[in-house]
């Protein structure tokens, strides 16, 4: 049998030799953007990687015949991001990818994320990342408020630090934080990101927070505070916010004519989540938030959990966590060491009201300046408990020689609110209109004697030296019951002319009232005079229609939570609480006793 090779034509020989060569023809057409790239490969392939640049996907540049990692540099003007796209186009997954990419390339000291998840709950899977300070959902309205308040507090604190240390730019501040010998190194916050997934729902459910987000978006970049927002329609994102979001990413829109980038977005294929267009007007395939090298969104929840664990294992530090208002704050927790009767008048009449939502510090009523307090709320909202706590705080600060109380307590809700020693000697407790009317007349006669004569000096007015005796607190629980039981003339009428001089004559008025009667109460000559004078007012839980106002937020709230309106502004607080007598809980005896 012959072993000679069969003869081949020249063409076959040439093709065989060319096929084995190392050099290949230039590929003009690259594969289509179909499969997403995992974050670990985005990080490895990102040749532009630098601090505060996050690799987020693959960008197709057909004119240059290139497909390279596309990312966002948040250190400059593009540090605020708007993401538009119809439902199920990949917006929430993009946010997950952004956070995981940032966490994979930065420490929890460098970047922190505070998230409001009003979408499909995808951001909840990132909660255990050390870079994430908190995630709030629509089922946690108080936590949503706190997330925004926390980020705004960072912005305000940065403004003060920049002013104090004459910092010229956020770039300089980042360098200062990296220097352990610089006071700025004590700042636990780096670049802070407020992430809101679902802007239309946010505006609809939290309209009072929109101005705060606008402030953060408009002012934050200069101080290293960023905003990232997703929306299904660009028209939902009003220009007052949209114009501050320098980076825009567009997934497939429900109406392609709404594009904010270019008509090229019409070419984004349907039913292809993750496909988008950037401001460079190139097509993108966004990555997926996984570190296992898998080019797929399958089993993404397990992949995210694994990625979160991998990143958490690398770090020992943690982003500052979102603090929330307590459901109940007791007076003794709020005011553990009250100043005593030996303190000066101003200190004794600085009375704690509750904890501020904005920064969780104590909110005070400066009763030496604004001597009254009004409390409006629906039944079971905590009106009487707050009045009880305020009365108790006043009594702890003042001796019986310094303050005395008169009560209008038709429901006996103020039992034990004021010690016997701090009650007026006569007419102190009034449970019906007959006794109250007589007591108020007598009180008015005595207080008129304290009106300042016309020839007093400023120093004498400040010292209140023309009269002596205790301040008087008129505590009225359930104002609506008092007015309903009265005739044509209010029992408080004799005190009405004295209210403008209340601070001079030592008169303080504390009133609780049903929220449904609040608007009518503020029209009353007595309560209305106190309200019109700018007295601190607590609006507890209620219906919006109970007190129609553009400036005052009345809505359903947990017991004790109130919208405080006062001379220093408006804010949400959790008011101080004391147990009523029937709820007092005694500690069990210790073992062996």
Curated annotation (Swiss-Prot):
GO MF, any single term: DNA binding
Function noted in UniProt: Part of the ESX-1 / type VII specialized secretion system (T7SS), which exports several proteins including EsxA and EsxB. Plays a role in DNA conjugation, in both donor and recipient strains.
Phenotype seen when the gene is deleted: Increases efficiency of DNA conjugation when disrupted in donor strain. Loss of secretion of EsxA and EsxB, but not their expression.
PROSITE patterns for this protein: FTSK
Summary of subunit composition and partner proteins: Part of the ESX-1 / type VII secretion system (T7SS), which is composed of cytosolic and membrane components. The ESX-1 membrane complex is composed of EccB1, EccCa1, EccCb1, EccD1 and EccE1.
Top-level taxonomy: Bacteria, Bacillati, Actinomycetota, Actinomycetes, Mycobacteriales
UniProt subcellular location: Cytoplasm
Domain FtsK residue range list: 66-260, 350-546
Statement: the UniProt record of this protein carries the keyword Transmembrane: no
Other observations noted: DNA conjugation in M.smegmatis is unidirectional with distinct donor and recipient strains; mc(2)155 is a donor strain while MKD8 is a recipient strain. Mutations in a donor strain that alter DNA transfer do not always alter DNA transfer in a recipient strain.
Name of the featured protein: ESX-1 secretion system protein EccCb1
GO terms for cellular component: cytoplasm
Record-linked Gene3D superfamilies: P-loop containing nucleotide triphosphate hydrolases (3.40.50.300)
SUPFAM superfamilies: P-loop containing nucleoside triphosphate hydrolases
Residues that coordinate or bind ATP: 85-92, 377-384
Keyword entries, A-Z: ATP-binding, Cytoplasm, Nucleotide-binding, Repeat, Transport
Any one Pfam family match given in the protein's UniProt record, by short name: FtsK_SpoIIIE
InterPro entries, per the entry: AAA+_ATPase (IPR003593), EccCb-like_Actinobacteria (IPR023837), FtsK/SpoIIIE/SftA (IPR050206), FtsK_dom (IPR002543), P-loop_NTPase (IPR027417)
Main subcellular location: cytoplasm
């Amino acid at each position: 049998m012959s072993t000679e090779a069969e003869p081949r034509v020249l063409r076959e020989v040439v093709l065989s030799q060319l096929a084995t060569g190392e050099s290949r023809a230039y590929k003009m057409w690259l594969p289509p953007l179909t499969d997403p790239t995992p974050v670990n490969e985005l990080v490895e392939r990102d040749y532009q990687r630098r601090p505060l640049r996050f690799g987020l996907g693959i960008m197709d540049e057909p004119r240059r015949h290139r497909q390279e990692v596309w990312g966002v540099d948040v250190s400059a003007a593009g540090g605020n991001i708007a993401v538009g796209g119809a439902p199920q186009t990949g917006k929430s997954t993009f946010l997950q990818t952004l956070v995981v990419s940032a966490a994979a390339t930065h420490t929890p000291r460098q970047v922190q994320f505070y998230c409001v998840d009003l979408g499909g709950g995808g951001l909840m899977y990132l909660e255990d990342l050390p870079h994430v300070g908190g995630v709030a959902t629509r089922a946690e309205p108080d936590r949503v408020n706190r997330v925004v308040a926390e980020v705004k507090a960072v912005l305000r604190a940065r403004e003060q630090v920049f002013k104090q240390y004459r910092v010229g730019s956020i770039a300089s501040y980042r360098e200062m934080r990296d220097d352990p010998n610089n006071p700025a190194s004590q700042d636990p916050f780096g670049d802070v990101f407020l992430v809101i997934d679902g802007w239309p729902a946010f505006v609809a459910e939290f309209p009072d927070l929109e101005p705060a987000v606008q402030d953060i978006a408009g002012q934050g970049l200069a101080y290293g505070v960023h905003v990232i927002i997703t929306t299904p329609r660009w028209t939902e994102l009003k220009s007052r916010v949209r114009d501050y979001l320098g980076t825009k990413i567009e997934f497939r829109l429900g109406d392609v004519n709404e594009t904010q980038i270019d008509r090229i977005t019409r070419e984004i294929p349907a039913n292809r989540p993750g496909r988008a267009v950037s401001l460079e007007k190139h097509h993108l395939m966004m990555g997926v938030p996984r570190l296992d090298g898998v080019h797929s969104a399958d089993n993404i929840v397990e992949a995210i959990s694994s990625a979160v664990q991998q990143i958490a294992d690398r770090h020992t530090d943690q982003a500052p966590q979102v603090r929330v208002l307590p459901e109940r704050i007791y007076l003794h927790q709020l005011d553990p060491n009250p100043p005593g009767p030996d303190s000066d008048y101003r200190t004794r009449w600085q009375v704690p009201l509750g904890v501020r939502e904005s920064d969780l510090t104590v909110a005070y009523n400066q009763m030496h300046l604004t001597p009254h307090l009004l409390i409006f709320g629906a039944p079971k909202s905590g009106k009487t408990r707050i009045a009880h706590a305020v009365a108790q705080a006043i009594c702890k600060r003042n001796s019986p020689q310094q303050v005395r109380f008169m009560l209008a307590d038709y429901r006996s809700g103020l039992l034990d609110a004021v010690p016997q020693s701090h009650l007026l000697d006569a007419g102190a407790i009034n449970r019906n209109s007959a006794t109250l009317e007589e007591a108020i007349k007598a009180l008015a006669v005595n207080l008129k004697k304290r009106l300042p004569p016309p020839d007093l000096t400023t120093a004498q007015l400040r010292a209140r030296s023309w009269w002596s005796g205790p301040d008087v607190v008129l505590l009225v629980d359930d104002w609506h019951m008092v007015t309903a039981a009265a005739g044509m003339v209010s029992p408080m009428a004799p005190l009405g002319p004295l209210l403008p001089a209340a601070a001079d004559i030592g008169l303080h008025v504390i009133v609780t009232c049903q929220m449904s009667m609040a608007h009518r109460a503020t029209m009353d000559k007595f309560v209305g005079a106190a309200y019109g004078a700018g007295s601190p007012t607590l609006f507890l839980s209620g219906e919006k229609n109970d007190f129609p106002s553009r400036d005052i937020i009345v809505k359903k709230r947990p017991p004790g939570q109130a919208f405080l309106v006062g001379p220093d502004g408006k804010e949400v607080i959790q008011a101080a609480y004391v147990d009523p007598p029937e709820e007092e809980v005694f500690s069990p005896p210790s073992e062996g006793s």
